[in-house]
């Protein structure tokens, strides 16, 4: 009977374990002219998911993801995205844009978050 108790304990621990997190890095760095003219943005983006199959979908649709992000970045005003509030707004908009795109292309959206790991406006 003690063996059964150990099996139950292991099963409970496995159920309580947080899902494995994976990241998809949009490569190479994104560089786009800003709508405000004369300025550009350079940034690196990481997409977080807890679904390994969805990670493969992100890889498959990498060019479409990159294109959508470049279009979104080129619509931005440099003054707005220099503030932390502006960056957070852009992050949320980018997450929504990529989530909608993945829903359209793969039939699901398993994105958990989007992170800017480099962010430069000049």
Say what each PLM segment does.
Residues 1-122:
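Flexible, low-complexity charged segments
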């Amino acid at each position: 009977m003690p063996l059964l108790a150990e099996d139950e304990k292991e099963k409970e621990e496995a159920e309580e374990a947080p899902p494995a997190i994976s990241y998809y890095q949009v490569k190479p760095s994104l560089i786009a002219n800003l709508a405000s003219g004369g300025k550009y943005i350079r940034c690196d983006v990481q997409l977080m998911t807890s679904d390994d199959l969805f990670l493969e979908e992100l890889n498959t649709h990498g060019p479409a993801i990159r294109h959508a992000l470049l279009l979104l970045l080129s619509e931005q005003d440099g003054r707005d995205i220099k503030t932390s509030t502006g960056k957070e707004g852009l992050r949320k908009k980018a997450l929504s844009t990529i989530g909608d795109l993945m829903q359209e292309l793969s039939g699901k959206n398993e994105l958990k978050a989007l992170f800017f790991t480099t962010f430069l406006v000049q």
